[in-house]
Amino acid sequence: MRHIDHVVVAVRDLDGAADLYARLGFQVGPRNRHPWGTENRIIQFRQSFIELITAPTDADIPPHAPGHFSFGAFVRDYLQRREGVAMLALSSADATADAVRFAQEGIGDFSPFRFERTGRRPDGSVTHVAFSLAFAVDTQAPDLGFFTCQQ
């Protein structure tokens, strides 16, 4: 059975949103930068997290392409229309198998996407993190992104 891995909340002012969540009593991690141009701050829970994310206007963001879901372009385009919950990530034991299943079910035909980066834990210590993502789309909810996240 899957569980919610994390919720992606798109915001124009990343530090302002982080400040709000901190004032609400959450521990908000430091700013991270993805190689595809987005920046985030994480609010970690035991088995899930909230990802506050933004797409700086000067970011070099790869475009969508056949078979390729551009995470950065999705966030940028979402923020041109609104702020809020932009994506729902479900847990995965095998993102490659998820991508195959999504294609068979007609809800995604995207190559899995893998990336690694250095992150910081809430206590400030450095950690290495790696993710494999499989993306799906819902034509009934085109402004909401769905993906599975294998960590």
Predicted regions and their residues:
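Short, solvent-exposed coil/turn segments
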Residues: 2-4, 36-38, 142
